[in-house]
Amino acid sequence: MAKVEIPSEVTGNVWKITASVGDTLAADDVIMILESMKMEIPVEAPEAGRLVELLVRVEDGVEEDQVVAVIET
Amino acid sequence: MKAAVLREANTPLEIEEVSISKPGPREVLVRPVAAGVCHSDLHFMDGSYPYALPTILGHESAGIVEEVGSDVTYVKKGDHVITCLSAFCGHCDQCITGHLSLCASPEVGRMPEEAPRLHKGDETIHQFLNLSSFAELMLIHEHALVKIREDMPMDRAALIGCSTTTGVGAVFHTAGVEPGSNVAVIGCGGVGLAAINGAAIAGAGMIIAVDMVDSKLELAKSLGATHTIDAGQCDAVGEVKELTQGGCHYTFEAIGLKATTEQAWQMLRPGGAATVIGMIPVGTMVELHGVDFLAEKKIQGSNMGSNRFRVDMPRFVDFYLNGKLHLDQMISKHIKLSEVNEALAALKTGQDARHVIMFDQ
């Protein structure tokens, strides 16, 4: 099994986390929603897998390219 | 209410029945009269900017206040308003230091633990940019609208809600164009044309419009462009440098592409400033020749024209009504909500300036 790190594409704040550690995710499933410059930007699973780590909490600030979650494929 | 819902990127919007909440203490229910269909909507529809789905697009509108929350005193039922995505909290660092358009406070929306403003049964419909104007009603924060005079035509007022403020504001506020300075604007869509009109109002000397569509270059002339360049027929950078004998004081990129951003930089004279208004797709990197910094060239972004919209928009309304701001030519067609997909498709061709949805009253 391979671990896949999921980075944020933008700088912003974590508005809502929609998945939990242990969840089985399909490709493109939404893990969390970031708020950046008035936009609600989803962070999605790039491929199918199991969510093994959430590295941020609601209201945390995140930087572009910061890893926010890890899935195991 | 009927609304145009985006459920998946790169698929048409669906006209659906959607429910809208009652106003919270600081919220206002607005019945839109007109909503512009903007190229920025297309960026989210085609996925070049990701957005939480499903959502109702639309962010450029004018309407009439239908109902206000218990704490709202700024507007009352029946007031004419323009909505703006630059909702401001009024007390964060950015607001307090005068940069209201950069306010990032989430409090102008609803928090995850609150009932959503828009929903369909148990399904949350994400509000687009705290507005979602492709709908028969909008529920927004009181700091996402401005009152306007009632003799302002609503279809023209809608344009002030985004494209006019973005283009004119970039010239007035972000760049601070001085009278007599030379300006080039790359891209003559709604925002670029507004920048050209703004440069004319600001008293710019040479105003060079750059595009690849003849009809848009003609429109640019009617809004104040002193020169036009068809970038499909020549080296636009070379032409600008020749016309200005060395480059512009100010350039504006109003498309959102790497190549045209780099051209905006290359068109500058030493000491000049390039302002990037266009939405460059997420993940795109821009390359600049490092030695150019020795010539004190500057490059900056502009978001919604660095606006203070409660002050700016009523002024832009006055500019229109006293003949300085030319909004009549900007509207190429009035449409119904059900025709929104055709309007978005037309934007892709780059032929039309703007379609405006008119809602039945």
Feature names for model-found ranges:
Chain B
Residues 21-35, 46-96, 101, 147-151:
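Glycine-rich beta-strand-centered segment in the early N-terminal region that forms part
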Residues 2-4, 14-19, 31, 62-64, ...:
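Residues located in well-ordered beta-strands
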Residues 246, 250, 262-266, 310-361:
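C-terminal hydrophobic helical "lid"/dimerization subdomain
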Residues 136, 143-145, 149-234, 238-239:
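Mid-domain Rossmann-like dinucleotide-binding core that forms the NAD(H)/NADP(H) cofactor-binding site
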Residues 9, 213, 280, 305:
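Residues in the short beta-alpha loop(s) of Rossmann-like NAD(P)-binding domains
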Residues 85-143:
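Cysteine-cluster motifs in flexible loop/terminal segments that predominantly coordinate metals
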